[in-house]
Amino acid sequence: MKILFDLLPVILFFVAYKIAGGNQAFAHELASRWLGDGIAVTQAPILLATAVAILATIAQIGWVWMRHRKVDTMLWISLAIIAVFGGATLFFHNPTFIKWKPTALYWLFGGTLTVSAVIFRRNLIRKMLEAQIRLPEPVWKRLNLAWAGFFILMGFLNLYVAYNFSEEAWVNFKLFGGMGLMLLFVLGQGFYLSRHIQEETT
């Protein structure tokens, strides 16, 4: 359930885009009414989907705050990035900004892991996981490096899809491609870590 909740803005973005794409005349009328004139019919689906994603992220944070009176830093970061890039897309009626949003998030994560390890000598992956698993120090370093590299590569991959494929293909990749690659990476990490956990506990 938590995974679905975390993915809610992405899922609603996808659903809104598909619904608006199947009803372009109505979507164009709605987008023009809410976001101003000068919007092309083909732009309406991505603009409405962006607005839905922003509202979903705000609602997500509101729900978490009402239940726990505390919001994770990651949610605030997600809100800031969707507000900046999504807001720019809505203001300028230009989908380029929202297409850069996943890359900005990936590179922020990858950069944070790298800078923390290289400059501050802090392994953030270890800090997050050491309460659950015990690993040799070299494995922690490789794990941190692997995640940093994964996020940086995902940022480049997002841009490649955004600039070399159709808008609809990018929207599909945003949900299914990104999440699918993340799942495969996590499974691969699990197999790799299981060997070292077994070695340490035997």
Curated annotation (Swiss-Prot):
Taken from the record, one Pfam family name reads: IspA
Query: What is this entry's stated membrane topology?
Result: Multi-pass membrane protein
Lineage, top-rank taxon, reads Bacteria
The subcellular localization recorded is: Cell inner membrane
Transmembrane ranges, per UniProt, are 3-23, 46-66, 73-93, 100-120, 145-165, 173-193
Q: Name one GO cellular component term.
A: plasma membrane
> What are the protein's UniProt keywords?
Cell inner membrane, Cell membrane, Membrane, Transmembrane, Transmembrane helix
Q: What is its main location?
A: membrane
Q: What does this protein's UniProt record list under function?
A: Plays a role in cell envelope biogenesis, maintenance of cell envelope integrity and membrane homeostasis.
The record's family statement is: Belongs to the YciB family.
Protein name, please? Inner membrane-spanning protein YciB
**What is this protein's gene name?**
yciB
